[in-house]
């Protein structure tokens, strides 16, 4: 239960974080008004239809004063009566014409300007009072201003200079307004547009301005709007961010304010300059761990009341070199005031970052306050402010904090399109109860978006894109380029339910709603969620107004719930060439589709995101549990398999190796199965030029025609050290023949010699260890432990001795049996204490001549060194030469008895009876090493015996092979033993050595015995 609650808590936390940092998606419009429908709307072009010779409008500004719309353009100002309902074209009622003089146009051309620029573009149109209007124009790059009467548009008074009141170029932005009888303007004050200024003129008092060429005050600004609120005048603009210069050139949106009663500074500081100028950043961004900013202010409204709060609403875009993106943000005037009461920002050195100024360093009275108000109430005018206050505000005009948007997020965003939003108009009292806020936003592509805004942070619904209107009329506006499609300004005429959309070459009048498009389909009317539309009692969809409350209507702008409504079966006529003569006809240009059953069912985005995320987490958890369980079962199964395999292999290897290594202590001869695989014999100690077979099987190997090297016979394996107990010759013969028959019949299976005991057979007490012949680096041989190599060796011998007959094979077999019989007789006589050594040597001489090995010199291959084996089986390296004969060691039979050191006895040959002989089985008797060592009685304790010079041809599986007598090592019993030799130790007898120069005659008579745990020589 605790785990479940913990998971639920984590899930809710992640959902809340996801909602907080998720980037808002673009909403699809509920309805779309395409060009075929919108081109019926009336258009104002500034010239009568058919008069194409007249210049285009060159729209500059648009202002609504009471029931008249003033449209200013190039050389002219038009008035439009809003009470008239135009049909296809908007006709101006009056026109003001103000053209530049010829001299001014010539001077403009002399300054290098194009003739199309050398005209009078009206940039300022500000009412001074109810009767007079202040008008300024560029006047061919020589700005001038005039007063006109509003009623008649007649010129009244004299021309005054437009410097610092009107820009020189029509492409430069500017704002102006009258407050308390004074003109506040913001523009550029020179021909090169390098001196940006916020300027106050006219009225009583001296003119004031911002500091010239001071980037801390303003830097390359674009002024957009100015409003009067309380004791201040607010300017909204965008500029190059001076606090961002160290990180690159970026544009920030600003709001600046000045006191209306500002009189400038003293003669020492800020004389004829603003003493109350402060500015702050407008922050329109998507919240999250890393904010996404819309920094470029494009347009902003006047102060409007939204939910009883004085608010300004602006449209912001991303940087010009960034991805296209736009947002609509609202700012409370209270939040703006709060920021101006906050901390200041400063840069201590030109290369340092901007930081906040501590409050204790802010002088009194607080900079930015208005004289006779608030903290500066004691001062009559700003001229009386202390120099410290004036100096501080001169160098610290920027506030540290930025103005946050209402609800800390944009009301609406548009980021999945290639165009940016450029203009805005807001109806803050839409709907029959005037409780909805509808935003109209223009764009660069000539598209107007109609948005039902989410104005409350506690609302369950986000903003909804109601309509997407393609407003630009290609046929009537005569666009010269794509820039002409940009919406420059929007003017709302709520009283006449119209929106005027201004382009550079025309102004189009668009109704605020298109309720007639839904006809008699109630479901479509309700699902539109348009505050201007409702289902009327007459059974049709129409526009609702506050005066229609008593008549009754049905509307659901909050949710658009149509679940209780049936489908619309009426299909409105579709016309590809609609009749646009009837304005607003219910069927003109409408393309309609039959509504499906639940097509208008809307699911809130937060609910959808929550459900999808919960399903994903649940699925991931289930999948993780399943994978974990399966993996755990699989790992356990593999461990069990590997454990069983290792146990079986360990048992097999250990038992087999034990049996093989204990082949020195073999029990009586038995016959065993031939299909049992033999484990690998010391594969880690001996190296070969051929790799072992993958299965590790070791089969019988046959000596090549040059003779099997004795090194392979050195391995202490049962095959190389047979033990033959005292038995009858007939019994031994039968066993040998039976073993030989099995070896000949099955060559591909592992072979066991009759002398080898089973892997787990107990050792016999009468067992006598045989001698071990160890490898020498001088011997050449070709060793292979693989079945394939043994098979190839056998085939090679058979191919070489191909002409031999079957009789030779039988003869070889008889000779092998005779050799075994001779060996048995020898052992029998050795165990007899009354036997005659000379008689025995006579028998040995006969058997000795039957088994001979090739000399070492006939070997052609170089054997690999086996240093590890020598180090492990011998004592530390001796001083014997590399070509010394084979070494031998005597292995004690009983582990519990301390081992004796092996004595090396050298001396001159005493007599021929001391000659050492070797008994070996033929190589075809399933021996992997090709050499078997025998046990022989010892006839003396030292001395060398001469190497016989005779050589004899022996047979290997019916093949005659010339072998020669080789020096060898053997274990020999002492004549002092009775019956079986005691298991306390063995004495070493001299080995057969090659002829070497004589050594000193002094040799020890008995070997020294040391209780060591390793063998020495």
Curated annotation (Swiss-Prot):
Region described as Disordered: spans on this chain: 688-719, 731-769, 783-818, 873-912, 965-1017
Residues bearing attached sugar chains per UniProt: 51, 283, 435, 461
Domain spans labelled Sema: 27-512
Keyword Secreted attributed: no
Electron transport among keywords: no
Domain PSI, first and last residues per copy: 514-569
One BP term from GO: positive regulation of cell migration
Pfam family, one: Sema
Localization: Cell membrane
Residues in compartment: Cytoplasmic: 628-1017
Extracellular-side segments: 21-606
Main location: membrane
Residue intervals passing through the bilayer: 607-627
One GO MF term: receptor ligand activity
Ranges annotated as biased composition (Polar residues): 875-886, 965-981
Family note: Belongs to the semaphorin family.
Role noted for this protein: Shows growth cone collapsing activity on dorsal root ganglion (DRG) neurons in vitro. May be a stop signal for the DRG neurons in their target areas, and possibly also for other neurons. May also be involved in the maintenance and remodeling of neuronal connections. Ligand of TREM2 with PLXNA1 as coreceptor in dendritic cells, plays a role in the generation of immune responses and skeletal homeostasis.
Name this protein carries in UniProt: Semaphorin-6D
Organism: Pongo abelii (Sumatran orangutan)
Lineage, uppermost ranks: Eukaryota, Metazoa, Chordata, Craniata, Vertebrata
């Amino acid at each position: 239960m605790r785990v479940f609650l913990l998971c639920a808590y984590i899930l809710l936390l992640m959902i809340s974080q996801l909602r907080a940092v998720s980037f808002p998606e673009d909403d699809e419009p509920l309805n779309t008004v395409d060009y075929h429908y919108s081109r019926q709307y009336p258009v104002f072009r500034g010239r009568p239809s058919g008069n194409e010779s007249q210049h285009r409008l060159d729209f500059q500004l648009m202002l609504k004063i009471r029931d008249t719309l003033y449209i200013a353009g190039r050389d002219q100002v038009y008035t439009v009566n809003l009470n008239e309902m135009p049909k296809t074209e908007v006709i101006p009622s009056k026109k003001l014409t103000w053209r530049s003089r010829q001299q001014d146009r010539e001077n403009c051309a002399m300054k290098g300007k194009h003739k199309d620029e050398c005209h009078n573009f009206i940039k300022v149109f500000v009412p001074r009072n109810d009767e007079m209007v202040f008008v300024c124009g560029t006047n061919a790059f020589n700005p001038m201003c005039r007063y006109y009467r509003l009623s008649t548009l007649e010129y009244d008074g004299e021309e005054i200079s437009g410097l610092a009141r009107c820009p020189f170029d029509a492409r430069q932005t500017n704002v102006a307004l009258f407050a308390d009888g004074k003109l506040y303007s913001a523009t550029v004050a020179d021909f090169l547009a390098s001196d940006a200024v916020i300027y106050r003129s006219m009225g009583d008092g001296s003119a004031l301005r911002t500091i010239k060429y001071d980037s801390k005050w303003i830097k390359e600004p674009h002024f957009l709007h100015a409003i009067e609120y309380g004791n201040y005048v607010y300017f909204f603009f965008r500029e190059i961010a001076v606090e961002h210069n160290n990180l690159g050139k970026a544009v920030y949106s600003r709001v600046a304010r000045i006191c209306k009663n500002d009189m400038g500074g003293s003669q020492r500081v800020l004389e004829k300059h603003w003493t109350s100028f402060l500015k702050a950043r407008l922050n329109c961004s998507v919240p999250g761990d890393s904010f996404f900013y819309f920094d470029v202010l494009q347009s902003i409204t006047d102060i409007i009341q939204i939910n009883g709060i004085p608010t300004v609403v602006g449209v912001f875009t991303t940087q010009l070199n960034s991805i296209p993106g736009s947002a609509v943000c609202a700012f409370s005037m209270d939040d703006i005031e709060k920021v101006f009461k906050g901390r200041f920002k400063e840069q201590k050195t030109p290369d340092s970052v901007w930081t906040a100024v501590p409050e204790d360093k802010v002088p009194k009275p607080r900079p930015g306050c208005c004289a006779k108000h608030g903290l500066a109430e004691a001062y009559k005018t700003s001229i009386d402010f202390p120099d410290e206050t004036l100096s501080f505000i001169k160098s610290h005009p920027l506030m540290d904090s930025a103005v946050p948007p209402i609800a800390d997020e944009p009301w609406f965003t548009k980021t999945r399109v290639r165009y940016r939003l450029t203009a805005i108009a807001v109806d803050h009292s839409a709907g029959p109860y005037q409780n909805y806020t509808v935003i109209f936003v223009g764009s660069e592509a000539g598209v107007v978006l109609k948005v039902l805004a989410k104005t409350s942070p506690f609302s369950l619904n986000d903003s909804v894109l109601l309509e997407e209107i393609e407003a630009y009329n290609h046929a009537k506006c005569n666009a010269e380029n794509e820039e002409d499609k940009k919406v420059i300004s929007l003017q709302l005429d709520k009283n006449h339910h119209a929106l005027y959309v201004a382009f550079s070459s025309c102004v189009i009048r668009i109704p605020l709603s298109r309720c007639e498009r839904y006809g008699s389909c109630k479901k479509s009317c309700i699902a539109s969620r348009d505050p201007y539309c409702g289902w009327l009692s007459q059974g049709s969809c129409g526009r609702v107004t506050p005066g229609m409350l008593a008549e009754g209507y049905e509307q659901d702008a909050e949710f658009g719930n149509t679940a209780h409504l049936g489908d619309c079966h009426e299909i409105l006529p579709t016309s590809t060439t609609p009749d646009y003569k009837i304005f607003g006809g219910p069927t003109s240009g409408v393309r309609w589709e039959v509504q499906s059953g639940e097509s208008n069912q809307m699911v809130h985005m937060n609910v959808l995101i929550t459900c999808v995320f919960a399903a994903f987490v649940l699925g991931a958890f289930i999948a993780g549990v399943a994978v974990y369980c399966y993996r755990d079962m699989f790992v356990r199964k593999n461990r069990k398999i590997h454990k069983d395999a290792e146990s079986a292999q360990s048992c097999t290897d250990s038992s087999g190796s034990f049996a093989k290594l204990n082949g020195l202590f073999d029990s009586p001869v038995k016959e065993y199965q031939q299909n049992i695989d033999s484990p690998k014999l010391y594969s880690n100690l001996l190296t070969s030029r051929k790799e072992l077979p993958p299965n590790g099987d070791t089969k019988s190997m046959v000596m090549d025609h040059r003779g099997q090297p004795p090194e392979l016979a050195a391995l202490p394996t049962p095959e190389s050290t047979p033990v033959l107990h005292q038995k009858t010759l007939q019994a031994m013969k039968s066993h040998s023949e039976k073993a030989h028959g099995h070896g000949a019949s099955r060559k591909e299976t592992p072979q066991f010699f009759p002398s080898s005991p089973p892997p787990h057979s107990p050792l016999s007490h009468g067992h006598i260890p045989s001698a071990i012949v160890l490898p020498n680096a001088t011997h050449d041989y070709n060793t292979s432990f693989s079945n394939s190599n043994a098979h190839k060796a056998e085939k090679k011998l058979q191919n070489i001795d191909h002409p031999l007959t079957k009789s030779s094979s039988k003869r070889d077999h008889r000779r092998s049996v005779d050799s075994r019989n001779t060996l048995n007789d020898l052992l029998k006589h050795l165990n007899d204490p009354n036997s005659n050594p000379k008689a025995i040597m006579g028998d040995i001489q006969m058997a000795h001549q039957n088994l001979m090995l090739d000399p070492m010199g006939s070997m052609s291959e170089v054997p690999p060194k086996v240093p590890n084996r020598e180090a492990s089986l011998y004592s530390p390296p001796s001083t014997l030469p590399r070509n010394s004969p084979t070494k031998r060691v005597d292995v004690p039979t009983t582990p519990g008895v301390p081992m004796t050191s092996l004595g090396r006895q050298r001396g001159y040959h005493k007599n021929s009876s001391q000659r050492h002989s070797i008994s070996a089985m033929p190589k075809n008797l399933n021996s992997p090493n090709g050499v078997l060592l025998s046990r022989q009685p010892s006839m003396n304790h030292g001395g060398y015996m001469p190497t016989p010079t005779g050589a004899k041809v022996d047979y290997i599986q019916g093949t005659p092979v010339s072998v020669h007598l080789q020096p060898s090592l053997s274990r020999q019993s002492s004549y002092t033993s009775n019956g079986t030799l005691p298991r306390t130790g063995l004495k070493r007898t001299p080995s057969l050595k090659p002829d070497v120069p004589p050594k000193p005659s002094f040799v020890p008579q008995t070997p020294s015995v040391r209780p060591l745990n390793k063998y020495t020589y």
